[in-house]
């Protein structure tokens, strides 16, 4: 069974949590796209929900699928956000942002009563860090921000290289918010909460891809079926 089928099965399991009248956060990335497509099928059959997209890509996908959309300017809270992850550990802490939407993803997740993460089983790791950690930054003063980031890595017991994410045109990748992304290739993050705290206070850092204590449920699809992990 290929990974796309596993992602779709995880998305289908998360869809079972959706009820009519819910307000949903719609994640970004290949796994979240499967959820949006399956949700669209339910909407066409009469399910009434409203969604808040976490990126312009997801907005376009949701509109194509006939999903009614709104924004966090119009509603206060969401019932559930369903999103993917680049890595998830056994504490249900995550690395997200491989698709470049980490800022909006975190805003939407924080405004939700529950966050359900959907993924194939390869995303479950003992320690975060194998997947490069995305850090969204302001272009101004990039050199100073880089130096501050390296100091934060050292303080958190990490070591690694920072690379500016390229876009398709060969220039720097630009997020929906107009920022750049530095990908930190750390290999291993021994204390994700500590690193998250250190990154959050650096001037020039808009947001980082460590989602600590945010996921309520993780749905993992593997060759042996679906595994659901709930936050203790």
From Swiss-Prot:
Give residues annotated as binding substrate. 28-31, 83-86, 96-99, 123
Which major enzyme category is it? isomerase
Q: Which BP terms in the Gene Ontology apply to this protein?
A: pentose-phosphate shunt, non-oxidative branch
Q: Pathway of this protein?
A: Carbohydrate degradation; pentose phosphate pathway; D-ribose 5-phosphate from D-ribulose 5-phosphate (non-oxidative stage): step 1/1
Q: Which GO terms describe its molecular function?
A: ribose-5-phosphate isomerase activity
Q: What is its EC number?
A: 5.3.1.6
Task: Cite the Pfam families for this sequence.
Answer: Rib_5-P_isom_A
Q: Which UniProt keywords apply?
A: Isomerase
- Catalytic reaction list: aldehydo-D-ribose 5-phosphate = D-ribulose 5-phosphate
The active-site annotation reads 105
Q: What InterPro entries does this protein's entry cite? A: NagB/RpiA_transferase-like, Ribose-5P_isomerase, Ribose5P_isomerase_typA_subgr, Ribose5P_isomerase_type_A
Domain of life assignment: Bacteria
Its function, per the record, reads:
Catalyzes the reversible conversion of ribose-5-phosphate to ribulose 5-phosphate.
Q: How does it assemble?
A: Homodimer.
What family, per the record? Belongs to the ribose 5-phosphate isomerase family.
The name under which this protein is listed is Ribose-5-phosphate isomerase A
Q: Which species is the source of this protein?
A: Rhodopseudomonas palustris (strain TIE-1)
Gene encoding the protein: rpiA
């Amino acid at each position: 069974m290929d990974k796309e089928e596993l992602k779709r099965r995880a998305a289908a399991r998360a869809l079972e949590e959706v009820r009519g009248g819910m307000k949903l956060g719609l994640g970004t990335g290949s796994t979240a796209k499967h959820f949006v497509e399956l949700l669209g099928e339910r909407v066409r059959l009469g399910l009434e929900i409203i969604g808040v997209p976490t990126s312009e890509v997801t907005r376009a996908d949701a509109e194509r699928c006939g999903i009614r959309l709104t924004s966090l300017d119009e509603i206060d809270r969401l019932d559930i956000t369903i999103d993917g992850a680049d890595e998830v550990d056994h504490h249900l802490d995550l690395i997200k942002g491989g698709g470049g939407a980490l800022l909006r993803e975190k805003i939407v997740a924080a405004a939700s009563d529950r966050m359900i993460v959907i993924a194939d089983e390869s995303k479950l790791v003992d320690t975060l860090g194998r997947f490069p950690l995305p850090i969204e930054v302001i272009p101004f003063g990039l050199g100073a921000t880089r130096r501050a980031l390296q100091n934060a890595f050292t303080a958190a017991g990490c070591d690694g290289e920072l690379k500016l994410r390229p876009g398709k045109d060969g220039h720097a990748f630009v997020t929906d918010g107009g920022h750049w992304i530095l990908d930190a290739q750390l290999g291993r993050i021994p204390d994700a909460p500590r690193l998250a705290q250190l990154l959050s206070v650096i001037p020039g850092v808009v947001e980082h891809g460590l989602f600590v204590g945010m996921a309520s449920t993780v749905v993992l699809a593997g060759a042996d079926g679906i595994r659901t992990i709930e936050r203790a």
